[in-house]
Amino acid sequence: MSARVEADDWVYEMFPKDTPPDACGSFASFKRLWDSKRKGEALPAWKDYQLEDFADWYGWINVEDIMPGEPFDTVQRLWGTNLTTAFGKDQTGVRMREMKGSVYSDTDFDMRTKMVETHDFRICYGPANWSAQESWKKTQKQSYIELPLADDGHTVDKFIALT
């Protein structure tokens, strides 16, 4: 059962980690990969992946490290080249809070905090308001799946997303 939030022309859907991949639409194969890296109930770690795992999605992956302490924040560890083209700049090394209002909303912060606690994942879609390409802002839609990662299998310390 998913939880759905609509805000700022975006739809955010949260799913339990055990949701079958086929319930993830066009992201089924990415969810299947994430599931294949899990060990029982544990979450996969970033170190469980090999570059070859992402061959079908090169350029569309981003990975964020969760920063310790409060308030909640992340920093982009990996920002795909196709994302750089779409956004108009490389966001590698940029903090989530630095992108608040342009890329991330309050809803993103709230949902990610919940993902850390519950190990749920989310699928989101909406207009490309953030795009560097002016023509995309009204015509293009973006969708992505975002999944938690944990070096110890339990404490979420990263997010991996496919756009």
Positions of the model-derived regions?
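Intrinsically disordered, low-structural-confidence terminal and linker regions
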Residues: 1-3
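Sensory/regulatory domains in signal-transduction proteins
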Residues: 5, 10-18, 25-163
